[in-house]
Amino acid sequence: MKKNIIIVRGGGDIATGTIYKLHQSGYPVLVTEIANPSAIRRQVAFSEAVYEKSYTVEGVTCYFAENLTRAYELLKQRKVALMIDPDGAVIREVKPAGGVDGILAKKNLGTTMDMAPFTVALGPGFTAGVDVHAVVETMRGHKLGRIIYEGNAIPNTGIPGAIAGVAKERVIHAECAGILYGEKKISDYVQKDEVIAFIYPDTQGKDASGQEKKDGAFAVRATISGILRGLIRDGYLVTKGFKIADIDPRESEYENCFTISDKARCIAGGVLEALLHAGILPE
């Protein structure tokens, strides 16, 4: 069994930045995920390995492992492994050198300091020195990526960080519950008010005043013009208010759809620094 394994809870786009950097820095990385990940920026989320069995981001491939034996085999081959383990039960068995909570749920879903000799959490919902050993700031701005050893990250405002002066409008949430199917694909340029997806309600016959319908479905429209940077998977069951899409207003930033973001890289740097400062070195 490899030493100094780092377990990262969550494989969304922000966590993927950390997974990528730790792997490239020489750490064996095991990712744990839920059975139905809901990443929006799917092109740069290792959580897609749950559905595709393997997924590559910027030249690094993450492989799905059905069990811990398979995960160890992958780690021995210096590959990133991912397991379905929503409760973090595998952590007790692996006894990793470090644990990272990259779920970004804005609350603690069960990560504790005793899960590993050193634990790090990304963003609000954790108190450094109580829940985990360190917290890394995830709010865009001057403090992004800063390591906190006492206290908390900046509280969640509910408003996304601004890109090209656009904040709240660039993220789209479901206006009703149902099963989503995209009309556009990630990297498409979309115009404001253009239909990008349809949500098919569980119960037929429901009405949503003012919403265009297609075979009983409700239209999801672009809130701004720009590049469709993120869109939840076809067939995903969403609830009202669920985050389903992300538009980048910068028309020239097509390649951003396929590369780890500046935000994710900055946060990853904070995690790497925290691990090194704690004396947890790559193999």
Segments and roles (model prediction):
Residues 1-283:
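Well-ordered secondary-structure scaffolds
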